[in-house]
Structures are given as structure tokens and as C-alpha cells.
Amino acid sequence: MRDAVAESVARALAQPYGMIFARKAQESEGKPPELLTSYECVVRFHAYARTYSRERRPAVRGCLEKTLRAEPDYAEATACLSRVYMDAVRFGWDSGAERDPLGRALALARRSVALAPHSSQCRHALGMALWFSGDVEQGVAALEAGLALNPSDSEIMADLGLRFAVRADWARATDLLEASFARNPAQPGHYHIGLSMAHFAHGRYEAALAEARRARSRDHAFGWICEAVAAARLGLSQDAAAAVGEILALHPDYGARVEDDLAARNVEPGLGRAIVAALRDAGLAAAPQRLPRVV
């Protein structure tokens, strides 16, 4: 019993989004980038990863790049920078002058594992980079290795659960996602899309809609996609259209490339077809369109 309590306290204090990280993030807030320590740059990454704010990403990337110029063998910073580059790919953001963000993410992740093979954070970065490179099996294996190294890491648990949800492996997906939120209620909201997809696939559309609304964001579309498909299946045409408007505000051409996008994300084909059909019913046309935003 004492060991379980100690583990719970340590998890609440030390893991990303925990109290220590939150305190350090507060302390570094407002500091000029040139005055941030290497550790503070890593802390800023974890603060950014609570919301995956597109606006904050360039500063976080710059801070981590500065860190690695000074400390090229800092494994965790290398893993964090890999994930920052990965975010441009997985969220469909314009990477601007960044060249080959996916290739850079994969190279950085592999280097981080070489530097620290027993680091769960490095395995996490490698798993995400491999997944979005199309290597589903090895991506899942790397995430599972990361979780084995640190079974208390609720972030790896949630990302692995989300990967299983995308592949329609519902039992493993829901077990991991529910466990991750039980361990860390402060987890980023976008992980709710995995639970939303599970409910959607089983015809529990009201529950799917409730989970999707917990994943709303002005910077990425996945919560809105889940909201649109659940609302469409509930016959809530205005809610569905409003969610489509949010998708299009982020990606005006999404209707024309939704099938390709879902395939690139390794969505299980049957689930992908169900999502596309519901998006069409929600009002997402194949031709580019714009609708008003709701948030």
C-alpha cells in the first residue's frame, strides 16, 4: 500500500504535466529565449505539448535547437525536438522554411535512442516518427518499449492507446486511454479522440460526441472531425455543419483530400470509410469550401 501511494505521489509530481513540470514551466514563462537553460527548454516543450499550440511551436523548436547546439548529446532534448518536427506532419501544419520535417523527426528520434537506449521519452519519439513514416508495426513496438521502460508514463500510454484506436483495436485502445486519464487527469484533451472513435465505431454517438467536444482545438482538426461525424449520425445538422466549418478553417481543402489524409495516418480502412461517409453527411464536400467558425 505504501509503495502504491509513493508511486502515485511521484507520478503526480514528476511526470510531464505533473506538479514539478508545471512549477518549472511557470518559473520560465516570460524569460527571453536566450536566458533559458537547456532544462527549461525541455520543460517548455512539455508545457507546449499540453495543448500543441501552433503559435508556440516555433519558439519551442528554436529553444530546443539552441540547446542542442550547446549540448548535442542531450538525449531528452533531442527526443523533444524530434516530436516538434513530427507535429508539423501529424497536425498538417505548414512547416514553412523547415525542410523534410518527417525525415528530421525520424533522424533525431533515432539519435536520441542511440544516446539513451533506456529512455522512455526517446522511445516515445521514435515510435511517433516511425508511425507517421508508415511503419505501423515498428512504431507500435517502439511505443510499447517506451511504456515497458516507464509503465507510469501516462503520455506514452495515451499515444499508444490512440494508435490502437486508429487501427480499430478497440479493447487495447480503450484500456490504455482510460488508464492514462485515470493516472493523469491533466492529460492533453486531444487524446479524447481515441475514446470518441471507439464510441463512434460501436454506434454510441452521444458518448462519441461528448468525448469529441473535450478534444476541441483551434490548432488541429481531429476533435472537430470526431464531433462532425458523431453529430451527423445523431441528426444534429447544425452542430455537424459547425464542426465542418472548424475543419475547413484549418484546412480549406480537406474535403478533397480526406481519404488520403486518413490513409496517411494509418487509419484502419473500414473505420476510415465510416468516417468519410459521416463527414460527407455532415456537409464536408469534395470541393474546397469555407464555413464560419464557432470558437
Model-assigned labels for residue ranges:
Residues 227, 240-244, 272:
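Short amphipathic alpha-helical segments that mediate assembly, nucleic-acid/protein binding
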Residues 8, 12, 48, 247, ...:
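Residues that form generic nucleotide/phosphate-binding pockets
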Residues 256-295:
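Terminal, low-structured helical/coil segments at or just beyond the last alpha-helical repeat
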Residues 14-22, 253, 284, 288:
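Charged, solvent-exposed alpha-helical segments that act as regulatory interaction surfaces
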Residues 216-220, 232-255:
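TPR/TPR-like (Sel1-like) alpha-helical repeat modules
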Residues 1-211, 222-227, 231-233:
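Acidic, proline/glycine-rich low-complexity intrinsically disordered segments
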